[in-house]
Amino acid sequence: MPAIEIGRICVKTAGREAGRKCIIVDIIDDNFVLVTGPKSLTGVKRRKVNIKHLEPTDKSIKIPRGASDEEVLKAIGENGLTDYMVEHVKPKLTPI
């Protein structure tokens, strides 16, 4: 199970969105990924994030690369993870 893969649910550990869950939508390079909440569900806006600022969880959903927020919302609903995505988590603080 690769930790950083498309569809992996992660917790943001840095910034104003720390503690909120997001989903990896695209892998940009070795250090950066594109994530989305989507904003209407978790408050995490679609943006490029350093992988050092993400904490992968054991859950993932099946979405295509570069999926839109609507596709992500549909996949979350189909997998019954809506309540899981909305709850906030205190991220584990690890030195970078």
UniProtKB/Swiss-Prot annotation:
- GO terms assigned for molecular function: RNA binding; structural constituent of ribosome
- Is Ribosomal protein one of the keywords UniProt gives this record? yes
- GO CC terms: cytosolic large ribosomal subunit
Query: Gene3D superfamilies, alphabetically?
Result: 2.30.30.30
Swiss-Prot/TrEMBL GO biological process terms: ribosomal large subunit biogenesis; translation
CDD domains, alphabetized: KOW_RPL14 (cd06088)
UniProt cross-references to HAMAP family, sorted A to Z: Ribosomal_eL14 (MF_00721)
This protein's encoding gene: rpl14e
Q: What is this protein called?
A: Large ribosomal subunit protein eL14
* Family to which this protein belongs: Belongs to the eukaryotic ribosomal protein eL14 family.
Against InterPro entries, the record matches this protein to: KOW, Rib_uL2_dom2, Ribosomal_eL14, Ribosomal_eL14_arc, Ribosomal_eL14_KOW, Translation_prot_SH3-like_sf
Identify one Pfam family in the record: KOW
Q: What organism does the record attribute this protein to?
A: Desulfurococcus amylolyticus (strain DSM 18924 / JCM 16383 / VKM B-2413 / 1221n) (Desulfurococcus kamchatkensis)
Q: What is the lineage of its organism?
A: Archaea, Thermoproteota, Thermoprotei, Desulfurococcales, Desulfurococcaceae
Give the keywords, sorted.
Ribonucleoprotein, Ribosomal protein
